[in-house]
């Protein structure tokens, strides 16, 4: 049974539908493409073509064009729409055209930076060019830090390390601050409350130091879909931004279902365990060979779900390899 058939069956199942409070269907969308810009370094298109990228999504091209005009931008498009390319292309293009150019990437967590930067490493290795990319965080060995400060074209770090490990020691980072062309801030929706206000102050210290050393970097911010991305980005960096919120990536049909676990005690209003219902529904999907991602609120929840789900979907030989747990 494929996903479409399973959805049709669930819609006809009263015991399931009586617990659904809302069901929204978002139709599929065709991709919108744009050619590579003429300003793009000629070493990039062949490498992208090797990865199956022969043209850009419209929002990726818009991001490149706005960056080329010197504007600060904020990209707000769905997951898996190619946001990473929106900042990697302008950054790599600038460094390939001027080997002195530098870029600073900020991610809220070390795990996220490791995931996102892997694509950047692959592009650089495929081009076989001398663009040195380093991660600079608490795990960076002391012996490697001098090389990062002196030779790093792209420095990948987090707000805490920027605050405590880079800005106070700016005299050791002269090469970076004198030539800083781009500052990339990914996942800006994570910077809210005290965390967000702290980052805003750190960014103001960063821009003040850049002015002292004679540079004026552009900011490229990326965010998940939120109500006020432009306002948030402008508040964080202290400057107006151009918002790119129309994704050119294709998307399949989506079903958004709000589901309440069934009531097991009407007098007390007690409902069935969320964990048990999650296991039941996800087992149904896995049994029908439908690729599924289940999110838990904590690491413990993920571990419990993974263990029980593996028990439910074991084949006759005891193999539960179709189910894997993932933690950042």
Predicted regions and their residues:
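Helicase motor core with emphasis on the C-terminal RecA-like subdomain
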Residues: 4-51, 55-58, 62, 68-81, ...
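Walker A/P-loop
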Residues: 84
């Amino acid at each position: 049974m494929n996903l479409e058939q399973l959805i049709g069956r669930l819609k006809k199942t009263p015991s399931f539908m009586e617990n659904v409070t809302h069901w929204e269907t978002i139709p599929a969308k065709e991709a919108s493409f744009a050619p590579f810009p003429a300003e793009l370094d000629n070493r990039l298109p062949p490498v992208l073509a090797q990865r199956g990228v022969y043209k850009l999504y419209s929002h990726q091209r818009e991001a490149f064009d706005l960056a080329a005009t010197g504007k600060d931008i904020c990209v707000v498009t769905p997951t898996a729409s190619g946001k990473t390319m929106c900042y990697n292309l302008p950054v790599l293009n600038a460094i390939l055209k001027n080997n002195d150019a530098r870029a600073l990437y900020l991610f809220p967590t070390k795990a996220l930076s490791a995931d996102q930067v892997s694509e950047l490493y692959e592009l650089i290795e495929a081009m076989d060019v001398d663009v040195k990319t380093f991660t600079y965080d608490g795990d960076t060995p002391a012996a490697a830090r001098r090389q990062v400060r002196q030779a790093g074209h792209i420095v990948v770090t987090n707000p805490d390390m920027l605050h405590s490990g880079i800005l106070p020691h700016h005299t050791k980072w002269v090469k970076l601050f004198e030539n800083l062309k781009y500052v990339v801030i990914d996942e800006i929706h994570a910077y809210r409350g005290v965390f967000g206000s702290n980052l805003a102050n750190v960014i103001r210290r960063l821009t003040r130091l850049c002015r002292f050393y004679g540079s004026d970097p552009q900011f490229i911010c990326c965010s998940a879909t939120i109500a006020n991305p432009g306002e948030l980005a402008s508040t964080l960096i202290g400057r107006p931004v151009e918002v790119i919120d129309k994704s050119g990536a294709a998307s399949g049909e989506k079903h958004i279902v709000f589901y309440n676990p069934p009531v097991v005690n009407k007098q007390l209003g007690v409902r069935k365990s969320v964990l048990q219902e999650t296991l039941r529904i996800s087992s149904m999907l896995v049994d029908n060979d439908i690729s599924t991602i289940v999110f838990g609120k904590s690491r413990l929840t993920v571990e419990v779900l993974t263990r029980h789900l593996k028990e439910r979907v074991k084949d006759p030989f005891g193999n539960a390899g179709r189910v894997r747990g993932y933690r950042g």
